[in-house]
Curated annotation (Swiss-Prot):
This is Pyridoxine 5'-phosphate synthase. Pathway: Cofactor biosynthesis; pyridoxine 5'-phosphate biosynthesis; pyridoxine 5'-phosphate from D-erythrose 4-phosphate: step 5/5. Catalyzes the complicated ring closure reaction between the two acyclic compounds 1-deoxy-D-xylulose-5-phosphate (DXP) and 3-amino-2-oxopropyl phosphate (1-amino-acetone-3-phosphate or AAP) to form pyridoxine 5'-phosphate (PNP) and inorganic phosphate. InterPro entries: Aldolase_TIM (IPR013785), PyrdxlP_synth_PdxJ (IPR004569), Pyridoxine-5'_phos_synth (IPR036130). One of its GO terms (cellular component) is cytosol. Belongs to the PNP synthase family. Homooctamer; tetramer of dimers. It is found in: Cytoplasm. The active site is at 43 (proton acceptor), 70 (proton acceptor), 191 (proton donor). It comes from the Bacteria. 3-amino-2-oxopropyl phosphate binds at residues 7, 18, 192, 213-214. One of its GO terms (molecular function) is pyridoxine 5'-phosphate synthase activity. HAMAP family: PdxJ.
Length: 240
């Protein structure tokens, strides 16, 4: 079974709604780890809409599992990553007008730039994952620029409106896993996963980690964060 990385961005979203000091995403990360999360994910966006620089620095000091820093492939973010030294970095696309990340990186179209960033980070001992759609050309390009990981974008699977459409998207994810592993890549997945749709993705052969945030934080509002994390662990095992 894959491990669970808990994305704490939306704890920071609530805090930033009032520009105050609570709830603190650092405290949320501690509680998530105590409840069984094997990793903590935070996305430091260029517009700083939720996670702040202060959060990333404190997370690096406090996270005892693995810290996954999601970021755009910009010079500013590379400098921050080289300074903070997360356990690994996930490169994601960003548009200021988007509500959340809308799709995977276009590795094919940005190959030279992404190859440079991957080399900068991995030469410094920071493994890099690329957040991509489960498309053969994007997977091949990710392997070609020597990223260690990919994170398959599960948004289309999560948003499928019929069982047939969901089955089709799950098959694409399965094929993506197989292709990536054959190319020497390690595979994570995330985006839009919930307690009700996570189990089939968790069962994909070779899947190593699922990064999940919004549904856990939404559940935590009602039942508390520790219970919400424990329930997600059960859901990943098909036991919820």
């Amino acid at each position: 079974m894959p491990t669970l990385g808990v994305n704490i961005d939306h704890v920071a979203t609530v805090r930033q709604a009032r520009r105050t000091v609570e709830p603190d995403p650092i405290a949320a990360a501690v509680l998530a780890e105590l409840a069984g999360a094997e990793g903590i994910t935070a996305h430091l966006r260029e517009d700083r809409r939720h996670i702040q620089d202060r959060d990333v620095r404190l997370l690096r000091q406090t996270v005892r599992t693995r810290l996954n820093l999601e970021m755009a492939a910009t010079d500013e973010m590379v400098a921050i990553a080289l300074d903070i030294r997360p356990d690994y970095v996930t490169l994601v696309p960003e548009r200021r007008e988007e509500v959340t990340t809308e799709g995977g990186l276009n590795v094919v179209g940005q190959r030279d730039r992404l190859a440079l960033v991957v080399d900068q980070l991995q030469s410094a001992g920071i493994p890099v994952s690329l957040f991509i759609d489960a498309e053969p050309d994007q997977i091949a390009a990710s392997a070609a620029i020597q990223a260690q990981w990919i994170e398959l974008h599960t948004g289309r699977y999560a948003e499928a409106e019929t069982e047939a459409a969901q089955a089709q998207e799950l098959a694409a994810l399965r094929q993506g896993c197989e292709q990536a592993i054959a190319a020497g890549l390690r595979v994570n997945a995330g985006h839009g996963l919930t307690y009700w749709n996570v189990y089939p993705v968790a069962q994909l052969p070779g899947m190593e980690e699922l990064n999940i945030g919004h549904t856990i934080i939404s559940r935590a509002v009602l039942v508390g964060l520790e219970r919400a994390v424990r329930e997600m662990k059960l859901a990943m095992q098909g036991k919820l």
